[in-house]
């Protein structure tokens, strides 16, 4: 545990050092730059805004962590995020329910969109033994172009001066309190659920042991193929 923490800390420090080196080469002051970075993002007034903006990154990071801990090298999070956002946007444009129903409905649509896109790579692996390392990367590009096409043509806001969709129904907007968006609460809830499943449930144990030693897992009666697909969908 201590070693993992140390590795992460060293990795972050190296990233800052490399960033500082690039800035020095380009003639910028890295200390001033990093000061402004932290001042803007971590000042008391800006922390709620920073947390709100971090939600998509944290959720996709959790998705990747489940896959990596269980074996699959799923690099398709950017494409899955786009497809989930696109499906949720379509739902928000054509469905209007009370907020208590609309928000969960759109969240479910977003999860389904991402799961279906990841499921394509999972099925290609299951049926044709195609590496998810390659297919998820390729699907990222397809999702990128498909989303770009959808925003520019069928979903384009006619009065807009640049590519964008119309606003979704207001009943689907996450509540906000100042700079704090309630999506942060959803993110924290998702973190607790995923942590519990991966570390405290039978399914999570099977996923982790499958990633560490698939032969041992198979001999122990673990359904490798089923778990692979489930993990990819998550």
Language-model features: locations:
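N-terminal signal-anchor transmembrane alpha helix
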Residues: 3-25, 29
């Amino acid at each position: 545990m201590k070693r993992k923490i140390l590795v992460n800390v060293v990795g972050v420090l190296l990233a800052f050092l490399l960033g500082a080196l690039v800035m020095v080469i380009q003639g910028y002051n890295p200390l001033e730059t990093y000061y402004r970075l932290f001042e803007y993002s971590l000042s008391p007034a800006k922390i709620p805004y920073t947390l709100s903006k971090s939600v998509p990154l944290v959720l996709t990071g959790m998705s990747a962590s489940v896959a990596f801990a269980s074996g699959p090298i799923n690099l398709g999070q950017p494409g899955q995020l786009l497809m989930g956002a696109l499906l949720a946007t379509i739902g928000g444009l054509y469905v209007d329910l009370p907020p208590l129903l609309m928000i969960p409905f759109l969240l479910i649509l977003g999860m389904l969109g991402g799961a279906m896109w990841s499921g394509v790579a999972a099925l290609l692996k299951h049926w044709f033994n195609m590496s998810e390392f390659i297919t998820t990367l390729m699907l990222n590009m397809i999702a990128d172009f498909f989303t770009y096409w959808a925003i520019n043509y069928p979903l384009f806001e006619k009065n807009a001066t640049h590519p964008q969709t119309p606003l979704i129904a207001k009943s689907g907007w996450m509540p906000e309190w100042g700079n704090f968006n309630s999506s942060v609460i959803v993110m924290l809830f998702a973190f607790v659920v995923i942590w519990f499943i991966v570390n405290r449930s039978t399914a999570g144990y099977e996923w982790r042991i499958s990633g560490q030693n698939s032969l041992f897992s198979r001999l122990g009666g673990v359904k490798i193929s089923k778990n692979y697909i489930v993990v990819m969908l998550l």
